[in-house]
């Protein structure tokens, strides 16, 4: 049924500050995707827009991710509409399965979910007006941003490998001596658990986005009834981490211990490119670090650890959920730490930076919602200072850190703990327990 809303009301809706913000964000995101598409094609590879468009017809890279994106979009739908959407997606996928089986093509599900998301976008534009159109477009936007984020990340990784031939692994590995070389230690532990432990950690590592959607669905469970989104939720943090993180890769390119000190992974890297095949059996020697040349295929995606950052965000946002969600958030964080270190994808220094990175972004988003009051500005500034200090220390003080592990090891951990403490203290002021005193945001100057 068409919504019957006065055109003046529609105009008023589009002039609301939050609608303007969402529209601006959409335009910026589109421009960003176009820029990445151009950059990827410059290096002879399809970009995020092309790869996503292919999945309308061809077998998608990740079916679970597409269905998770559809689930995220469906938070704006009624239960009847959700059942229709799920049925349509499954029906479309069955048709694709049958056709692929006939032509002996790659079998993968997920096209149906993408078709449903795109159909909802068409319905929003052609069959909805006013607030209902905005709400449905927000849902579609969140779903598409999740799948586009995966494609965007792939393009970013390609760009880092092509534009940053020199990597700084020797500096991070040297600094990691102050932390006791945790990647080497956890790597030996994971190997001792055998194939079972490795398969569990690998599944957790790969399905991180699906776990994020599960936590986000709980946060957004009232959207359909209230016809509005909450001010802050996990998806916002997840997307901002993915947007800002690759920029740090360009500044501090690192490939990881399995590549710099091992045989490589994911079909990239090799022993002849590494300093030696010593991970995880022998910690790297204490020699003066220097930038090292690496291939043009391996992503420079270690500093900071975005998997740790995303898992930390899931942990934070699961704290207000039911017990099973809190337990799941804790498990996902611990398992992600085990995978990132145990598979040799990251150094301990990356993990510390990833935690600080997440808390700073989370604080910034919360502070933005509250009007940038003093406590929020202080928290964001402190987190940014600590994060910057960590990266500078890894680059220019790595030898001193390795020579004095009894001093710098505790200092690194203390810097991370201090950000955690300030974040927790600030959140307690902003989100008091029921019955406690409520701190109101500081008054802001009126807009004239």
Specify the residue positions occupied by each region the protein language model found.
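Juxtamembrane "helix-exit" motif on the non-cytosolic side of transmembrane helices
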Residues: 36-49, 95-106, 127, 389-403, ...
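Membrane-interfacial loop-to-transmembrane alpha-helix junctions, especially the N-terminal start
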Residues: 15-28, 75-92, 134-140, 230-238, ...
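Alpha-helical transmembrane segments of polytopic membrane proteins
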Residues: 51-68, 107-121, 142, 201-206, ...
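Membrane-embedded catalytic cores of phosphoryl/pyrophosphoryl-handling enzymes
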Residues: 14, 288-400
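Transmembrane helical bundles and short interhelical boundary loops of multi-pass, membrane-embedded
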Residues: 381-441
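Membrane-interfacial catalytic/cofactor-binding modules of polytopic membrane enzymes
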Residues: 180, 250-323
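Intramembrane catalytic core of multi-pass membrane enzymes that act on lipidic substrates
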Residues: 110-206
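Interfacial segments of alpha-helical transmembrane regions
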Residues: 138-144, 216-267, 329-330
């Amino acid at each position: 049924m068409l919504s019957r809303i006065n055109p003046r009301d529609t105009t008023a809706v589009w002039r609301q500050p939050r609608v303007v913000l969402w529209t601006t964000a959409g335009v910026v995101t589109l421009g960003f995707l176009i820029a990445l598409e151009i950059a990827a094609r410059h290096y002879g590879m399809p970009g995020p827009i092309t790869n996503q468009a292919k999945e309308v017809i061809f077998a998608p890279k990740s079916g679970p991710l597409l269905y998770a994106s559809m689930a995220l979009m469906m938070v704006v739908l009624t239960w009847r509409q959700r059942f229709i959407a799920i049925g349509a997606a499954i029906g479309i996928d069955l048709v694709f399965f049958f056709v692929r089986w006939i032509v002996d093509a790659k079998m993968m599900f997920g096209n149906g979910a993408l078709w449903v998301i795109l159909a909802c976008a068409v319905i929003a534009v052609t069959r909805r007006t006013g607030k209902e159109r905005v709400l449905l477009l927000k849902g579609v936007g969140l779903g598409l941003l999740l799948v586009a984020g995966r494609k965007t990340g792939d393009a970013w990784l390609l760009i880092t490998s092509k534009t940053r031939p020199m990597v700084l692994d020797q500096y991070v590995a040297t600094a990691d001596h102050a932390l006791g070389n945790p990647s080497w230690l956890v790597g030996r532990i994971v190997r001792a658990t055998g194939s079972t432990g490795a398969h569990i950690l690998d599944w957790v590592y790969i399905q991180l986005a699906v776990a994020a959607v599960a936590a986000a669905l709980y946060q957004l469970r009232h959207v359909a009834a209230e016809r509005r989104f909450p001010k802050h939720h996990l998806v916002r943090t997840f997307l901002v981490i993915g947007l800002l993180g690759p920029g740090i890769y360009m500044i501090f390119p690192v490939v990881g211990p399995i590549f710099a000190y091992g045989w490589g992974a994911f079909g990239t890297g090799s022993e002849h490119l590494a300093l030696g095949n010593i991970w995880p059996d022998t910690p790297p020697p204490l020699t003066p670090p220097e930038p090292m040349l690496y291939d043009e295929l391996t992503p420079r995606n270690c500093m900071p650890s975005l998997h740790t950052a995303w898992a930390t965000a899931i942990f934070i946002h699961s704290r207000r959920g039911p017990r099973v969600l809190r337990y799941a958030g804790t498990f996902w964080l611990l398992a992600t730490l085990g995978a990132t270190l145990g598979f040799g994808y990251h150094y301990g220094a990356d993990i510390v930076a990833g935690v600080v990175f997440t808390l700073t972004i989370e604080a910034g988003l919360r502070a933005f919602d509250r009007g940038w009051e003093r406590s929020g500005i202080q928290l964001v500034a402190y987190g940014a200072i600590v994060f910057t200090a960590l990266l500078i220390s890894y680059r220019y003080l790595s030898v001193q850190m390795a020579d004095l592990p009894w001093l710098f090891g505790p200092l690194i951990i203390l810097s991370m703990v201090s950000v955690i403490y300030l974040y927790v203290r600030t959140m307690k002021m902003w989100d008091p327990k029921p019955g406690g005193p409520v701190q109101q945001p500081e008054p802001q100057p009126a807009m004239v």
